[in-house]
């Protein structure tokens, strides 16, 4: 079944460094790939490829568990999470574990449990990976036809797609269950400065949920990244989980239609390129979400967003100068615009100065001071609470702008501290990874299309310098 075509013709891109070197019995002569091409040697060995994937999952889960325990071991409850370079504990805290009112950590034991569970799981995955890579059957088709596949088998491929979609849907519903029944999640908008609460009144209205998808990505619109209440987030997961599970069942039960059979390339490398493209999109969306959204990524754990730190600075100095007798409603700044307050293009009262560009920021410490027409002057004069002053001063000095030498905050700010915000780390890393995944998508898509069209011959190797060199062994 697997030898319907010559591997040579199907995988013609070769580089002969040392054709005789054989790793685990899979040499260049039999697979068409040299040792350094890694899992490409396993393209038609479903059992060994399974081992590679399970082992990879084990490495991922091991990192999660080990890094989790590392963060727990270094965690200081007296300092905010974002000052300690943590990237995993904020996620656990956001899910409502170990935190109380205001995002204060009251118990680190759940974090320890999470780390240990991941470590134990990684051992199981690691064993399975090594077993399937070294001892298990090379191919699954003969002994376990349910788990076997041929890359060209369109029906089997969409069945596998369906199984993956169902698993993703179950994952979405796990968050829903946590929010509804298992202790709730952290809500930065809870009255009095954030708390863990169960979500009771889900947003299931399709016009609201899918309205986010139809919004513009710019300015105050912000596409799905603009979501700012947990009811919408959890309701969105109900919709997404349902769509994934129903779509998964659909793909398991049906065969691809003729237009889909014609439109797609049906080979292992093509599926790799589709997956890389999807992961790339995930990375770019995650980048924007963690950078701009302070509901899904509460500022109590991740530090303020860029716009939030900027608005916090304007607010802090408004409070200071108002105490010193300034009339913040009418004071004029160096540009002739309002020094503390001005109007937005649509007429709302907003903070003046350089932070005007961030006038559409929404944050739990600022919203109580807004009225129907933007910031309410009488509330700014009479209603500012001490917790709002404390929080804005804290956020002002923790802007997510880390320079290379890790001086956090605004470069000219004398109160800045030595730190880089986890928002900076998470946004930058996901952007960079998303970009590289996109390049990988283009690369493998190009190769897969060329191979399907039958003209991928690779570089002409007749005059390669390496051919005149002595073999490595």
Swiss-Prot record:
The modification Phosphothreonine is found at residue 15. It is a multi-pass membrane protein. Belongs to the PsbB/PsbC family. PsbC subfamily. PSII is composed of 1 copy each of membrane proteins PsbA, PsbB, PsbC, PsbD, PsbE, PsbF, PsbH, PsbI, PsbJ, PsbK, PsbL, PsbM, PsbT, PsbX, PsbY, PsbZ, Psb30/Ycf12, at least 3 peripheral proteins of the oxygen-evolving complex and a large number of cofactors. It forms dimeric complexes. It holds the Pfam family PSII. Keywords: Acetylation, Chlorophyll, Chloroplast, Chromophore, Manganese, Membrane, Metal-binding, Phosphoprotein, Photosynthesis, Photosystem II, Plastid, Thylakoid, Transmembrane, Transmembrane helix. One of its GO terms (molecular function) is electron transporter, transferring electrons within the cyclic electron transport pathway of photosynthesis activity. One of the components of the core complex of photosystem II (PSII). It binds chlorophyll and helps catalyze the primary light-induced photochemical processes of PSII. PSII is a light-driven water:plastoquinone oxidoreductase, using light energy to abstract electrons from H(2)O, generating O(2) and a proton gradient subsequently used for ATP formation. It is found in: Plastid, Chloroplast thylakoid membrane. InterPro entries: PS_antenna-like (IPR000932), PS_II_antenna-like_sf (IPR036001), PSII_PsbC (IPR005869), PSII_PsbC_sf (IPR044900). NCBIfam families: psbC. Binds multiple chlorophylls and provides some of the ligands for the Ca-4Mn-5O cluster of the oxygen-evolving complex. It may also provide a ligand for a Cl- that is required for oxygen evolution. PSII binds additional chlorophylls, carotenoids and specific lipids. Its main location: plastid. GO terms for cellular component: chloroplast thylakoid membrane; photosystem II. This is Photosystem II CP43 reaction center protein. Residues 1-14 form a propeptide. The chain crosses the membrane at residues 69-93, 134-155, 178-200, 255-275, 291-312, 447-471.
């Amino acid at each position: 079944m697997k030898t319907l075509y010559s591997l040579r013709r199907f995988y013609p891109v070769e580089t002969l460094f040392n054709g005789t070197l054989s790793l685990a019995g899979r040499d260049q002569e039999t697979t068409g790939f040299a040792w350094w091409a890694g899992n490409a040697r396993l393209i038609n060995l479903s059992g060994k490829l399974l081992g590679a994937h399970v082992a990879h999952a084990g490495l991922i889960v091991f990192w999660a568990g080990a890094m989790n325990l590392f963060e727990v071991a270094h965690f200081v409850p007296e300092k905010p999470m974002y000052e300690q370079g943590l990237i995993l504990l904020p996620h656990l805290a956001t899910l409502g574990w170990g935190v109380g009112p205001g995002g204060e950590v009251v118990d680190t034991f759940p974090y320890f449990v999470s780390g240990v569970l991941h470590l134990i799981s990684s051992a199981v995955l690691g064993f399975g990976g090594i077993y399937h890579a070294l001892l298990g059957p090379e191919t699954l088709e003969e002994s376990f036809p349910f788990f076997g596949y041929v890359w060209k088998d369109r029906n089997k491929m969409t069945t596998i797609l369906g199984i993956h979609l169902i698993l993703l849907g179950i994952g979405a519903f796990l968050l829903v269950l946590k929010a509804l029944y298992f202790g709730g999640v952290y809500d930065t908008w809870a009255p009095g400065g954030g708390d863990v609460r169960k979500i009771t009144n889900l947003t299931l209205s399709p016009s609201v949920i899918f309205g986010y998808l139809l919004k513009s990505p710019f300015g105050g619109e912000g596409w799905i990244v603009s979501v700012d209440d947990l009811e919408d987030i959890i309701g969105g997961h109900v919709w997404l989980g349902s769509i994934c599970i129903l779509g998964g069942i659909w793909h398991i039960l049906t065969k691809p239609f003729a237009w889909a059979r014609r439109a797609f390339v049906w080979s292992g490398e093509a599926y790799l390129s589709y997956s890389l493209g999807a992961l790339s999109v995930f990375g770019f969306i995650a980048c924007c979400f963690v950078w701009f959204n302070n509901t899904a990524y509460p500022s109590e754990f991740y530090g303020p967003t860029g716009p939030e730190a900027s608005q916090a600075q304007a607010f802090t100095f408004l409070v200071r100068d108002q105490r010193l007798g300034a009339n913040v409603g009418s004071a004029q700044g160096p540009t002739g615009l309002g020094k503390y307050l001005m109007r937005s293009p649509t007429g709302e009262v907003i903070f003046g100065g350089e932070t005007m560009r961030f006038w559409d920021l929404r944050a739990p410490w600022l919203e109580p001071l807004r009225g129907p027409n933007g910031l309410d002057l009488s509330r700014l004069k009479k209603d500012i609470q001490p917790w709002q002053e404390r929080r804005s001063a804290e956020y002002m000095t923790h802007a997510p702008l880390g320079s290379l030498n890790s001086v956090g905050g605004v470069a000219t700010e004398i109160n800045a501290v030595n730190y880089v915000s986890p928002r900076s780390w998470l946004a930058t890393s996901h952007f960079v990874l998303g970009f590289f995944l996109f390049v990988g998508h283009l690369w493998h898509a190009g190769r897969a299309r060329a191979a399907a069209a039958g003209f991928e011959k690779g570089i002409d190797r007749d005059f390669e310098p390496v051919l005149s060199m002595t073999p490595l062994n």
